[in-house]
């Protein structure tokens, strides 16, 4: 059974291609995820933006038609992107040897894939909003069965938070 160690003796690298038109948003989410890993283990993943800098286990993050490593994996048959092609805010996560791919159908899909990993390591979105501290762990290790996933399209296309500013209870 294939296992992927996110953080053990050291943390994995996270590769984001700077040529991806969604680079800025994806990088922000990847930095947040690296911070989450550090919060849980004390070891921070290194973000790399050049394929030549990758040394060892890596998380390759990007949108499906913008990241050359994701495109290469799809061409080789390692990664099946047909299930998210043309869909709204979807992602695929796939473990292949020492590479964990997170491929989004679009920028938001990719970001949701990154935050799914944060959820898997035990970090709540409330860590920032309400200081909910995650459980500390020495090692973060997952099997391919736990990591491999194809998300569904959201049932509501446009969603958000409405703040009632007519009678706010913020004071």
Please annotate each region the language model reported.
Residues 1-92, 146-147:
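Acidic, contiguous N-terminal accessory segments
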Residues 32, 79-171:
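Feature activates predominantly on carbohydrate-active enzymes
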